Amino acid sequence: MKNGARANIHLAVDTGMSRIGMTPNEASADEAARISRLPGICIEGMFTHFARADEADKAFYEAQYKKYREFCEMLCSRGVDIPIRHCSNSAGIVEGLDSNGLDMVRAGISIYGLYPSDEVARDRVKLVPAMELKSFITYIKTIGPGTAVSYGGTFVADRPMRVATIPVGYGDGYLRSLSNKGAVLIRGKRAEILGRICMDQFMADVTDIPEAEEGDQGTLIGRDGEECITVEELAALSGGFHYEIICQIGKRVPRVYLRDGKAIGKKDYFNDIYEGFGYM
């Protein structure tokens, strides 16, 4: 206020998430009206968050949306204008739940081209996965029967095997719970993970990919030829949630941004590289 600045704010309304926001009642409406009259404050918008819009049964969503609309009416009756009204998360967007009367949406998991759940109407919106995770083979060695691989010896070879090392681990956000379960795509074929995933590396079986060699690309998430490893597959194998898989990928992993299959930018936090973002 001393600098003559104005804060544009959005009010949060708790309609059923029990996370943040005003309870939608008369007392809260009075409080919002008082806030709207404060100097240096402009109520630019108001939002709520759907807790169960990704479920087939929309009853809870409908109850939340009704509370939100009623609270908007309470504010309007007190002379409070709400220019931007927004509720929908990715599930709401895919389902087209509140396309009438609102001004904005807040996409989350759908930005990555992923559906929020198996219960949303996927035929309404065609999403294409936008993220891949790739690395390469740094080393290949042959081991004999009885040889243990990685910490704890949880995998022991029962035959001669070719073992490839990939420089990605749980320090990069590649879940340790994928140990002895996950796979990496090499030359369009699946190479199963052997033993425990380390902090910075893991090992994979390339015995049946004789053409594999050091320097070959390894796809941890994404497509290689006819094979594909999805985020949902990794979530199922790890006993987790596909949102977690996306969020776990750490800053040590360089980001390369593509448009029409061509690299247009790169972020490499480790080497302090930020290229190609002048257009943003």
Residue ranges of each PLM-predicted region?
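Active-site loop/helix belt of alpha/beta enzymes
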Residues: 1-8, 14-136, 143-144, 266
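Structural motif
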Residues: 8-10, 44-45, 83-85, 103-104, ...
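Bulky hydrophobic/aromatic packing residues
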Residues: 10-12, 25, 221, 233-234
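C-terminal accessory subdomain/extension
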Residues: 142-280
